[in-house]
């Protein structure tokens, strides 16, 4: 009887210990969903940018989820779940989308594509973190594409991982002046009704070229939906500039380049807009674009960049300076979640958003696909870049200014 009682007590202790062990380990084996929202343009002339961003986000999330997921504050494993919204590159729709996202379980939103959406959208966010008198949305937005200069400073909740075009074109024109000292004049062309194109010509290219010693001999303007460029190219032909600097997106860039070829306008060099360093440009007018030079913050020059490009291709997308930022954004969000005690529970959504915002604001550097990215106090990025040129309907690295 004593032996039986002892065995029973031992069994009870064993079961109690096992139960306790099970309870303690369950927190570590549990899996939670971390909701992420993506948004951008998937309709209209520039829809390829949003489509590629969605493909990259899917690829990056699949990679993380299939390689261990994300470690949460209590040791549980988190798996990302993406919901992507089309804002149609319209400010009012972008604002509506983000208000909708704020009412979901998403802890962060990655987007938008268009600067004309980002600028007013950032304006509806709380301007200063912790300001009780400001009823603006307290939702971290981490932009991958909208590139117009200086937008992140609008709100403490706005962050961007986009290249600094002012630095890129300043360096490019200075380098071109050294490499081609015989070239003296520049003619500019701009997609006047698109915020990014307009800003980059008037505030960046038009400033950087004369600063490097070039003489500006004229400019031409057109609209995003234009299909005829006869008049603009005639003006280029008349100016006889050594360099044509084009600030427009792939659709109108190709239209312009084809018209230049038709009118036999052959400048010594053509400089393009960052956003046109994409496969869409080469697919639309590879022969006409031959030789165009564009600064870009993405090229498949590292193992990480090639890996991201391959995984994106599996999702039906292509990787360029915009969509590559979306991959980096997901990796940065994972890093911030793991370092800042995110719980990913239904009752911690707003607290998690605040922790992610604070974590992003605290970053000084992040790991990029082609090198280290510096973070600024205003929530912007200072990204490494190279000069790419179109060669045989492919993008090739012409020069790496870091080397």
Predicted ranges, named:
Residues 123-131, 201-297, 399:
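Extracellular/periplasmic bilobed ligand-binding domains
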Residues 48-55, 70-151, 161, 222-229, ...:
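Beta-alpha junction/loop-to-helix N-cap segments that form part of ligand/metal-binding clefts
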Residues 94, 160-185, 229-230, 253-254, ...:
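Hydrophobic alpha-helical segments within soluble ligand-binding/sensing domains
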Residues 42, 154-221, 243:
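An alpha-beta-alpha
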Residues 101-114, 134-144, 186-190, 240-250, ...:
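Periplasmic-binding protein-like
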Residues 260-329, 339-340, 390, 395-402:
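Extracellular/periplasmic periplasmic-binding protein-like sensory domains
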Residues 313-323, 334-399:
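Segments of small-molecule ligand-sensing domains
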Residues 37-60, 85-91, 190-200, 318-324:
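Extracytoplasmic "Venus flytrap"
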């Amino acid at each position: 009887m004593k032996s039986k009682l002892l065995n029973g007590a031992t069994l009870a202790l064993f079961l109690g210990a096992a139960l306790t062990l099970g309870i303690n380990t369950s927190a570590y084996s549990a899996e939670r969903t971390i909701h992420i929202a993506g948004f951008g343009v998937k309709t209209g002339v520039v829809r390829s940018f949003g489509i590629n961003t969605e493909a990259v986000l899917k690829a990056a999330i699949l990679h993380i989820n299939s390689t261990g997921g994300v470690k949460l504050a209590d040791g549980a494993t988190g798996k990302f779940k993406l919901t992507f919204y089309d804002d149609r590159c319209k400010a009012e729709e972008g604002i509506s989308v983000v208000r909708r996202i704020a009412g979901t379980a998403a802890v962060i939103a990655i987007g938008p594509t268009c600067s004309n959406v980002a600028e007013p959208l950032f304006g509806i966010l709380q301007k200063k973190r912790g300001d009780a008198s400001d009823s603006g949305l307290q939702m971290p937005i981490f932009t991958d594409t909208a590139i117009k200069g200086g937008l992140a400073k609008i709100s403490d909740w706005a962050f961007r991982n986009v290249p600094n075009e002012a630095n890129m074109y300043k360096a490019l024109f200075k380098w071109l002046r050294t490499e081609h000292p015989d070239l003296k004049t520049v003619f500019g062309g701009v997609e006047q009704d698109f915020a990014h194109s307009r800003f980059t010509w008037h505030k960046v290219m038009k400033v950087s070229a004369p600063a490097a010693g070039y003489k500006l001999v004229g400019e031409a303007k057109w609209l995003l939906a234009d299909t005829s460029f006869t008049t603009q190219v005639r003006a280029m032909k008349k100016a006889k500039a050594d360099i044509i600097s084009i600030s427009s997106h792939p659709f109108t860039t190709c239209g312009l380049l084809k018209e230049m070829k038709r009118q036999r306008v052959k400048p010594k060099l053509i400089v393009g807009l960052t956003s046109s360093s994409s496969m869409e440009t080469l697919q639309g007018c590879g022969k006409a674009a031959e030789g165009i030079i564009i600064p870009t913050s993405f090229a498949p020059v590292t193992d990480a960049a090639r890996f991201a490009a391959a995984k994106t291709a599996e999702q039906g997308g292509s990787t360029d300076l915009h969509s590559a930022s979306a991959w980096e954004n997901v990796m940065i969000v994972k890093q911030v979640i793991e370092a800042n005690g995110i719980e990913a529970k239904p009752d911690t959504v707003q607290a998690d958003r605040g922790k992610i915002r604070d974590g992003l604001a605290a970053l000084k550097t992040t790991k990029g696909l082609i090198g280290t990215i510096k973070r600024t106090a205003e929530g912007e990025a200072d990204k490494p870049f190279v000069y790419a040129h179109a060669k045989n309907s492919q993008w090739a690295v012409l020069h790496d200014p870091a080397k």
